[in-house]
From Swiss-Prot:
Name of this chain's protein: tRNA uridine 5-carboxymethylaminomethyl modification enzyme MnmG
Species, as recorded: Xanthomonas campestris pv. campestris (strain ATCC 33913 / DSM 3586 / NCPPB 528 / LMG 568 / P 25)
HAMAP family: MnmG_GidA (MF_00129)
PROSITE patterns, sorted: GIDA_1 (PS01280), GIDA_2 (PS01281)
Signal peptide start and end residues: none
Subcellular compartments: Cytoplasm
Amino acid sequence: MSDSFYRYDVIVIGGGHAGTEAALAAARAGARTLLLTHNIETVGAMSCNPAIGGIGKGHLVKEIDALGGAMAKAADLAGIQWRTLNASKGPAVRATRCQADRNLYRSAIRRIVEAQPNLTVFQAAVDDLIIHNGAAEGDSVRGVITQTGLRFEATAVVLTAGTFLAGKIHVGETQYAAGRMGDPPATTLAARLRERPFAIDRLKTGTPPRIDGRTLDYTMMDEQPGDDPLPVMSFMGQVSDHPTQVSCWITHTTEQTHDIIRGALHRSPLYSGQIEGIGPRYCPSIEDKVVRFADKTSHQIFVEPEGLDVTEIYPNGISTSLPFDVQLALVRSIRGFAQAHITRPGYAIEYDFFDPRGLKASLETKAVGGLFFAGQINGTTGYEEAAAQGLLAGLNAARQAQALPAWSPRRDEAYLGVLVDDLITHGTTEPYRMFTSRAEYRLQLREDNADLRLTGVGRAMGLVDDARWARFSSKQEAVQRETARLSALWATPGNALGREVVDTLGVPMSRETNVLDLIKRPELSYAALMRVPTLGPGVDDAQVAEQVEIGVKYAGYLNRQRDEIARQQRHETTPIPEGFDYAGVRGLSMEVQQKLERVRPQSIGQAQRIPGMTPAAISLLLVHLERARRSQVA
């Protein structure tokens, strides 16, 4: 093999949702990239729930897509049941979710990975990092060493190990080392990382038992069909991309289920002290639900198909690590599950994660230059959160290899910006999940405008290909053209257009009104307006029509939010130099100094969001930074 086989710009460790997006982003950005995975067959595998999107999560998927990522495209090719959540609410909180055929999804991701120029995939477990100990410039990564002793060199390395770092599975009293059921853990790599100056702790997550769908009685459940018309996830997607559609089903636990669980809590690793890691608050185990909500006589379960060509179903809502005999009893006590056959047991898994306050906004570690972390190892939960971090880390790894400045979106620019800022500023003690409520500027950060917010940025950094750019540019021009067309038209009580509006829509017309302003009326929409003969038929692209309508209906709110953002941005990006001496700022309390030393914020904006930070402390920092700037100029 030639030396070039062992030398890359960027190496990505792990082929899950974070790893694939990281490798694809680095390669799209022009870096020669190597993706190392312990098993090529599991690249893009959905380890837990076979679904993509949801509240907050769908927003991240749209942002990944707007930046040229793969997740939305794969979801469109694999989604077998589609829903728009919060459809009756405002556009800021509407979210797309699909039930996915896990085999179709994995195959789609693998095809995308294998077709990507600049990207090489190699099957190998990584046991160690090659770290250069620089006396002056600090530690920096130089490559990796595999389980078989191969050494691959790179300028930047992205670690996306998921639950594999010292992973330990629990089923009742039984526990054993694993990355997920059926896969070995990264034990040696975890031990090597613990020798480095990283703050490491343990988290846990879990998954429910899988069931043979042929053994269920669906007559005892409520059918949950998908939406009609079907949504799409990718801005490049079409409904024709979707495979055959199927329904999900809803059932409930019973009082017998809860009695079985209560009677076996002493055998639960969650309650016996066997599991030390903290689990996800918003995806609790069925044991947790029964204990925490003791007054409830039943809990809802979503019966979700795993795919079109398999019989397994995913019972969403009964994640458990109880012993198998208890799992079988509790499953068979659920409505419609009396004859259920379990195909795989549920389990909990504990794993190492790193305090994300040890990361820069680029997701590069502060301790080791050129080393980036993404995904569950940063304390998050969920495919979407992992994939979004992967894209950002992969992009910035490529930019570092090319000696370009790092990029990270602000909180007002993307949910990805909210996610990263929350992690690196506040850290986390439990698996972090994205919600729309975490974003203070969510009216600006909608699913529908993710491309308008990010595709231009992605194009400038090499993430967006010509086809996506052409589609985006065409859409942007169409929105501007249609908005201009309607804004040039006026309806009055006495002119022909005004009479058409009154006759067609049945709305009163007492004064001259701009046609665009008609859309601001709660009872009117763009589609309704296009029924007026002179105005219709309008644009046939639903995305364009949606942008025209939202831009008009919410103009006042959006303008106010932009003004608020402008005020906030005054000092948001004021940089704080690396290695800044907080002890040298006179007037800072010891408590504030300790908080600042712990987080080491990169900007005044980040410093402002540290819990317990006071306006007075920020003022002192600004004064000190300004003095330092003036002294340098002088």
